[in-house]
Amino acid sequence: MDKQALFDQIKGGLIVSCQALEHEPLYTKGGGIMPLMAKAAAQSGAVGIRANTVRDITQIKEAVDLPVIGIIKKDYEGTPMYITVTMKEVDELVACGVDILAVQGTSALRPDGSTAAQFIEAIKAKYPEQLVMADCATIEEGIACANAGADFVGTTMRGYTPETQGCDDIDFDFIHELSEKCPAKIIAEGHIHYPEQAKK
């Protein structure tokens, strides 16, 4: 599916995050829980799923016929980056067939010293057909990632970086400004707790 067709499919709809880390109650070593959550989301009208780890993504893609935004969360020493940080994770996500590959697009450097924009350029050079989403916190980050080749920019990280501390609620003005200034397609993510917020 090309970028415009995928965007048309998800535009105006709800993408549901189906994730559980090892310390969380819904995590199991064998998996199987996240695809059930994805099925429930699909039956309730979700237009896409966001998932973490190759195992969960693979199981979810077998369970539902919806686009999947895939990530791999992993902590690295010396950097606050943790969402799809290295090319190793990118290779694994591409191999399991994610529709959109999401990476952290904030201003901190990766373990190898590269910026988010440089990382996205490297991904696009290696996998030119792979759709990429940058999880950003500021307008400047979103623009930089889009100019580097990100097809989608998410507001995922707003409120979770030193520059955006205190942004603990959904910021519609920020989303509007980002959509006006950023050349990539925008996915509003983070601090969306109620149906009324999602509808807006």
Report the location of each language-model feature.
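N-terminal amphipathic alpha-helix/helix-capping segment at the start of soluble metabolic enzymes
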Residues: M1-T28, K61
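Surface-exposed amphipathic alpha-helices with a cationic face
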Residues: Q4-D8, K39-A42, I57-D65, A116-P128, ...
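Short beta-strand/loop segments at the ligand-binding rim of alpha/beta enzyme cores
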Residues: K11-V16, V64-G78, K124-A137, S179-G190
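Conserved beta-strand positions in the central sheet of alpha/beta enzyme cores
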Residues: I15, G48-R50, L101-V103, M133, ...
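Catalytic cores of alpha/beta
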Residues: K29, G78-C96, A137-D151, A184, ...
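Charged helix-capping and loop-helix junction motifs
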Residues: G30-P35, Y82-K88, T115-I120, C167-H176
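Glycine/small-residue-rich loop that forms an oxyanion/phosphate-binding "nest" at active or ligand-binding sites
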Residues: L66-S114
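Glycine/Thr-rich beta-alpha phosphate-binding loop at enzyme active sites
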Residues: I100-D112, A146-F174
